[in-house]
Amino acid sequence: MRRQFSEYIGVDEHGHLRIEARDALDLADAFGTPLFVLSENQIRHNVRAITRAFRARYPRTEILFSNKANNNPAVRRIFNQEGAGGDCFGYGELYLSLLAGTDPGKVLLNGSNKQAPELTLAIESGVTINLDSLEETDQVAELARQVGRRAKVNPRTRLMLSDLDDVAADWPRGVAVGPGARAHKFGMHYEDVLETCRRALASEWLDLVGLHHHVGRWTNDLGLHRAVVREQVAWAARLRDELGWTPAHLDIGGGLAWGRPEGHGPDANDRSAPDYDAYAEAIAATLSDELQRYGLGEPLLMIEPGRALASNIGVLLTRVGTVKTWPGNKTWVNVDASQNHLPNILTANWYYHAVAAANADPHPAELGEVDLVGPLCTFDVMGAARCMPALRRGDVVAFLDTGAYGETKAATFNAQPRPATVLVSGERAEVITERETLRDVIGRYRVPPRLLLDG
């Protein structure tokens, strides 16, 4: 390929966008638009690359894909084949992971308000539960007694991260990382974690395994992850000193960003996102130093990357409709995709780089500024002030890096059906999510018979 957007997505000698061995134009013709397209081999490449980066620096590392980024069972099967576990949030993601054959020993269940059905399924299956409150600790113990099987549990810590009180977040704007992280609903402060551990150690129905924390993506500054590791290890040392219990594993969650030079993420600021090696070096070096400092041995390190693994595995193909120009050279290019399909554009001012599928590496002289807009009854700006080659009705535009939080967040505003998803492996292209129909969109509605009567 004459230009690469990722290892398996790029531009061929004709200037066409290709996903592995398939021309994006052919995929749009064969499967219709809008269309999510995923590269199987890019998924495999990413898992292997991040695993290699971490294990080269800290061999006892387990990769748990954050399923909320892309919970398609076909995608989950690929992660299984590559040896990755999974982080699940709620009954649906847990059920899909187990349905896809994920090793329960590599699955974690998260959530701040877990219900009995999902907790019971986790206990029965041997999935580890990240406890979010003292109340949940007792609830899980009772459910385990009813099931007749010990439940594996980790307390979810609510770290203070005071070192980050003066560090400005990239997103959301105007927030410092430390106070912002402390303001969310997840996890327990130290005294509750201590009491949770006491109760778990005293219970015949709870198997206390490790500690869990997830800070999320606030900044591309690697100091965020160093601070999480330092404080998580310090909490582990305090628990050892007070209880005589040492965590067998430390889960530091996700929050690993991903970016490209053309831009990605909130306000396009993930151009500066660290790569896998930079993340691994920062986390592993800090972890090794802190473990040695406190004499905590070598627990299993668990990380939960989502977007960092799934963003660049996919594109969203969309077809051009009306092209409208306003006097003064303002041009709107209407496409059949919308913010329904990439809702982070609306909620986080997310930037997805866009290319013309038939001219994906244009000469600068061919470019003009346009707004790419969708069909919804909102402004529905998919990409403002984008430099694109000339576009006309029927052309195909591709939004890059849509493999994470596209399909999983897609909505049906304006009663718009959601796209299909196709998985490409070499020359092969297979539907892994069927295109929604209008019948699917309206099928749950019910009109009481009395409202059908005239008058």
Where are these regions (language model features)?
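Short clusters of hydrophobic/aromatic residues that line enzyme substrate/ligand-binding pockets
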Residues: 9-11, 17, 186, 372, ...
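Charged (often Lys/Glu-rich) extended helix/loop segments that serve as interaction or gating elements
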Residues: 282-284, 288-292, 296-455
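A generic local secondary-structure boundary/capping motif
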Residues: 119, 141-147, 185, 199, ...
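Secondary-structure transition/capping motifs at alpha-helix termini
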Residues: 102-105, 147-150, 203-206, 238-246, ...
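Active-site beta-loop-alpha junctions enriched in small/polar residues
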Residues: 66-72, 91-92, 112-114, 132-136, ...
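Structured core elements
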Residues: 85, 108, 128-130, 154-156, ...
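Active-site loop/helix belt of alpha/beta enzymes
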Residues: 1-3, 162-319, 414-416
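A charged N-terminal "starter" segment
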Residues: 1-131, 137-153, 202-207, 385, ...
